[in-house]
């Protein structure tokens, strides 16, 4: 598969393999034994660590596995079968549409294709998706249920959404009550250059 780190890159993290041993304290502050299944929303210490990294309150964080693509798939699958926040399950609707910034991440598009969701191309600009088009489409069509977003270093162009683009996403007024922004911020801390993190 593509995008896998090289052996040299993997070797950079070898020191982490020696941090824990059979003598390590593997209990959380709340008493949870980290060797066991844990809790549904994730280990509190991990939530605090990630919260500090992304400037988010740990109470608003859920820790999943290491694949954002799995999270996206599971979220779409659940929306199809159970709906979003009490709304009609998408599988019971005549039409479900999704906005797809292009060029974009083909594996996001594969998820929508798998579930038979109609994809609407939205051109990428140097600042992110064409927000004039996004605002117009979502405000007029309640069949549009979401948009795929990779806001930092978006594949394949490496575009990072501008602050204004992010603000416009926050101000969207979608016709669909169950419209969601699928914000796959997988590269939020993976900067290539110390001095250029946009």
Map each language-model feature to its residues:
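Pocket-edge structural micro-motifs
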Residues: 1-2, 65
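Glycine-rich phosphate-binding segment of PLP-dependent enzymes
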Residues: 2-37
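Conserved core of the PLP fold type I
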Residues: 23-26, 30-177, 188-197
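Walker B catalytic acidic pair
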Residues: 184-185
């Amino acid at each position: 598969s593509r995008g896998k780190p090289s052996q040299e890159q993997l070797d950079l993290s070898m020191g982490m393999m020696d941090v824990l041993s059979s003598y390590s304290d593997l209990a959380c502050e709340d008493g949870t034994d980290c060797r066991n299944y844990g809790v549904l929303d994730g280990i509190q210490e991990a939530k605090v660590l990630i919260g500090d990294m992304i400037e988010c309150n740990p109470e608003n964080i859920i820790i999943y596995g290491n694949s954002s693509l799995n999270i996206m798939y599971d979220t779409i699958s659940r929306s199809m079968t159970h709906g979003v926040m009490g709304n009609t399950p998408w599988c019971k609707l005549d039409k479900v549409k999704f906005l797809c910034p292009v060029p974009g991440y083909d594996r996001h598009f594969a998820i929508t294709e798998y579930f038979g969701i109609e994809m609407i191309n939205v051109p990428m600009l140097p600042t992110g998706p064409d927000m004039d088009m996004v605002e117009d489409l979502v405000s007029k069509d309640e069949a549009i249920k979401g948009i795929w977003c990779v806001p930092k270093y978006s594949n394949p162009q490496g575009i990072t959404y501008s602050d204004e683009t992010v603000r416009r996403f926050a101000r969207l007024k979608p016709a669909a009550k169950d419209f969601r922004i699928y914000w796959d911020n997988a590269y939020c801390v993976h900067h290539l250059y110390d001095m250029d993190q946009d």
